Amino acid sequence: MIGMLKGRVESVDTSNAVVDVHGVGFELRMPSNDLTAMHMGQDVKIYTSMSVSQDAITLFGFLDARSKRMFLQLQKVSGVGPKVALSLLSTLAPDDLAQAIHDGDDKALSRAPGLGRKGAQKIILELKGSIDVDKIETGEPTSTQRIPTDKGVEQVVEGLMSLGWKQADAQQAVDSVISSSGIALPLEEGNVPTVLRLALTSLDRGR
């Protein structure tokens, strides 16, 4: 099972991206917002989910872990496959999608191509109680929304950059650590060393 890729964008279009990982090109189906944010030659870290059918093996990719979790959660609803789940994430950012499910907003969900009103209502019925709205309110990063940068976060990012990490990789690691640990923003000075240590561990693990 391929859970994550780190490599360089070889090509990108409106529905797919090819990422070169040590000379091997992985073709990925991705949400439109993620594809728009990518460009050729860019170094990326992509969270992946593999779908196996009778006709093909498809690798789906996401620029943040929350999008991948939402993608998998949507498929727990009977009748919702990877194509519909991807369509939803191409129409609504994960936080907006979670909020729409929590609020019972079937009109917002049915804007996704391939999903009708009844399908939207079924998703709401089956997932409404399992969507964690607290993660929305704390500003967990998505492909279109990142954790707001404050002085504490800037200190951590600058510290990682001084150790040789690229700014984009450093920022992504800090965002991920803050989201997964539940540390509140703005980042207090006392939490800066903790976040720095956790982010550095995450980056070293991803090498």
Swiss-Prot record:
Segments for region (Domain II): 64-142
MF GO annotations: ATP binding; four-way junction DNA binding; four-way junction helicase activity
Subcellular location: Cytoplasm
One GO CC annotation: Holliday junction helicase complex
Main location: cytoplasm
GO biological process: DNA recombination; DNA repair
Chain spans, region Domain I: 1-63
Region (Domain III): 153-207
Keywords linked to the UniProt accession: Cytoplasm, DNA damage, DNA recombination, DNA repair, DNA-binding
Region Flexible linker, annotated ranges: 143-153
InterPro entries per UniProt: DNA_helicase_Holl-junc_RuvA_I, Hlx-hairpin-Hlx_DNA-bd_motif, NA-bd_OB-fold, RuvA, RuvA_2-like, RuvA_C, RuvA_C_sf
Alphabetized Pfam families for the sequence: HHH_5, RuvA_C, RuvA_N
Function: The RuvA-RuvB-RuvC complex processes Holliday junction (HJ) DNA during genetic recombination and DNA repair, while the RuvA-RuvB complex plays an important role in the rescue of blocked DNA replication forks via replication fork reversal (RFR). RuvA specifically binds to HJ cruciform DNA, conferring on it an open structure. The RuvB hexamer acts as an ATP-dependent pump, pulling dsDNA into and through the RuvAB complex. HJ branch migration allows RuvC to scan DNA until it finds its consensus sequence, where it cleaves and resolves the cruciform DNA.
Domain remark text: Has three domains with a flexible linker between the domains II and III and assumes an 'L' shape. Domain III is highly mobile and contacts RuvB.
HAMAP family given in the database record: DNA_HJ_migration_RuvA
Family: Belongs to the RuvA family.
Quaternary structure (record): Homotetramer. Forms an RuvA(8)-RuvB(12)-Holliday junction (HJ) complex. HJ DNA is sandwiched between 2 RuvA tetramers; dsDNA enters through RuvA and exits via RuvB. An RuvB hexamer assembles on each DNA strand where it exits the tetramer. Each RuvB hexamer is contacted by two RuvA subunits (via domain III) on 2 adjacent RuvB subunits; this complex drives branch migration. In the full resolvosome a probable DNA-RuvA(4)-RuvB(12)-RuvC(2) complex forms which resolves the HJ.
Protein name (record): Holliday junction branch migration complex subunit RuvA
Organism of this sequence: Bifidobacterium animalis subsp. lactis (strain AD011)
